[in-house]
Design a protein with these regions (language model features):
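N-terminal Rossmann NAD(P)H-binding glycine-rich loop of SDR-like oxidoreductase domains
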Residues: 10, 14-18
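Conserved NAD(P)H cofactor-binding loop of Rossmann-fold oxidoreductase domains
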Residues: 75-81, 228
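Substrate-binding pocket helix/loop in short-chain dehydrogenase/reductase
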Residues: 83-84, 91-93, 178, 189
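A short, exposed helix-loop element centered on a Lys and neighboring polar residues
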Residues: 107-108, 153
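C-terminal substrate-recognition "lid" of short-chain dehydrogenase/reductases
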Residues: 119, 198-225
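Catalytic loop of short-chain dehydrogenase/reductase
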Residues: 121-159, 172
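Short, small/polar-rich loop/turn modules that mediate ligand/substrate recognition or access, typified
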Residues: 159, 164, 218-221
Length: 229
């Protein structure tokens, strides 16, 4: 039985990943969310963790998150509406803490167990926006996602222990957030994608599932699912 932690599990991608994993009897799922729990219809017992990651610190983290996860997926995506010209240190620090530092801390705390079990699968997430300097109002978010592409050398060395760590650079995806964008603006954005279409939630979730379930060789990689951008 393997223990899975999904951070940011109430996102569209998170819900799709849960739906694909929930029928697996060999997995124990722990789903983190901030405000609203993911809407999943299943009789299977799921450990729901409601917590604003900004309130996590080194003293209380082990009371909220366990330290023996076998699989960790970070889908946290806190966005603050700030550009480079008006960002505040407080908001940038908050965004980086939520999207990057706390997930790294949670990952670090489970590595000892992964080494002992000689198994670990970790998927972090980044954004195609960092390739272009981020959006005009997503400076802090894009900076935090850039940080998520940093793979510590200590983690790189764990490949020999069957602990595989990868970061997905996710392209513009057909989620609720993008559906709320003015249609004309969204069409203009799609035209910038060589594949000339948005990624589907299935596209992204399928890669996540592959990396945690079927992957036996890919590690320490930034995997782009961006339609050619």
């Amino acid at each position: 039985m393997k223990k899975v932690l999904i951070l940011g599990g109430n996102s569209d991608i998170g819900i799709k990943v849960i739906e694909k994993l929930i029928k697996d009897k060999n997995l124990l799922l722990s789903i983190h969310y901030n405000k609203f729990p993911p809407k999943i219809s299943s009789k299977k017992k799921i450990n729901l963790i409601k917590k604003n990651l900004f309130d996590i610190n080194e003293k209380n983290i082990t009371k909220i998150f366990e330290n023996d996860y076998d699989i960790i997926i970070n889908l946290v995506g806190y966005v603050s509406d700030q550009s480079f010209f008006n960002f505040s240190l407080k908001e940038v620090n908050k965004t980086i803490l939520i999207n990057s530092i706390i997930p790294y801390l949670i990952i670090r705390n489970s590595l000892k167990n992964m080494i002992k079990q000689k198994f670990g699968r970790i998927v972090n997430t980044s954004s195609v926006g960092i390739k272009f300097g981020g959006g005009k109002k997503t400076f802090a978010y894009s900076l935090s996602k850039y940080l998520n592409e940093f793979i510590p050398s200590d983690i790189r060395e764990l490949a020999s222990k069957n602990i595989f760590y990868n970061t997905l650079r996710i392209g513009v995806t057909n989620t609720k957030i993008h559906k709320n964008i003015i249609n004309k603006s969204l069409k203009s954005r799609v035209r910038l994608i060589p594949a000339n279409k948005l990624a589907s939630v299935d596209d992204i979730s399928n890669y996540i599932i592959y990396l945690i379930r079927n992957n036996n060789f890919i590690t320490n990689e930034i995997v782009s699912i961006t339609g050619g951008e």
